[in-house]
Regions:
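Membrane-proximal basic amphipathic "stem/tether" segments
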Residues: 1-35, 196
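S-adenosylmethionine/decaboxylated-SAM
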Residues: 30-198
Length: 198
């Protein structure tokens, strides 16, 4: 199973396209097949651009899944830090948390990503030091996203961003939470990635 997952992640774009095609064949209109995660090329380019507007940024990704976005950020962020947070409680393959974490650590091996096994809530309680940009892609529940956004706003983080803005999945509350905290007119959106720059 481990080899299958490695192969799948090695061909992530093709696999995601295949899953999307499968979903449409089965009439999936909820976006649930997109739960496999990952950013589109356009979204990845935007997130990396946001993270590299200045040299020496500390960038935190909350909800790293397998570390694909964090790995790309680590390649792009010059002179800064990239921290990836995940509690490994969910993945699309149903891997046990310890295997999920070990796999993610393997994906991130050789990068400057600091991987922290922690929930978003627990991490926010203990965070120390300057954070220039945060990218939220952990829980997509309204209450959780709203708490993350309010915390980041109060902490004075320069760039507050995340994924799944405008996602039609009825279980997701990202759009509502982000709009309430920041106001719809203050949000820049690329694909389903959003950002507020302060």
């Amino acid at each position: 199973m481990f080899r299958r997952i490695v192969t799948l992640l090695g061909h992530w774009r093709e696999a995601k396209s295949a899953f999307s095609t499968l979903a449409s064949l089965y009439g999936d209109k909820t976006g649930s097949m997109d739960a496999l995660g990952g950013l589109s090329d356009e979204e990845m380019k935007a997130v990396c651009w946001w993270a590299t507007e200045d040299i020496g940024y500390t960038v935190v990704e909350v909800g790293t899944l397998f570390g694909i976005t964090a790995r790309e950020l680590a390649l792009q962020v010059v002179g800064g830090r990239v921290i990836a947070i995940d509690n490994f409680s969910w993945n699309p393959f149903g891997l046990p948390p310890n295997i999920h974490e070990a796999f993610t650590r393997r994906i991130l091996r050789g990068t400057k990503v600091e991987l922290v096994n922690c929930s978003s809530e627990d991490w926010r309680k203990q965070v120390k030091g300057r954070i220039d940009m945060v990218f939220f892609d952990a829980s997509h529940q309204y209450e959780d996203v709203k708490a993350e956004c309010e915390w980041a706003k109060a902490a004075g983080i320069k760039i507050i961003s995340g994924h799944d803005y405008g996602n039609p999945n009825p279980l997701f509350g990202v759009t509502r939470a982000v709009d309430e905290v920041f106001g719809k007119d203050n949000i820049e959106v690329v694909g389903m990635c959003w950002r507020v720059k302060r």
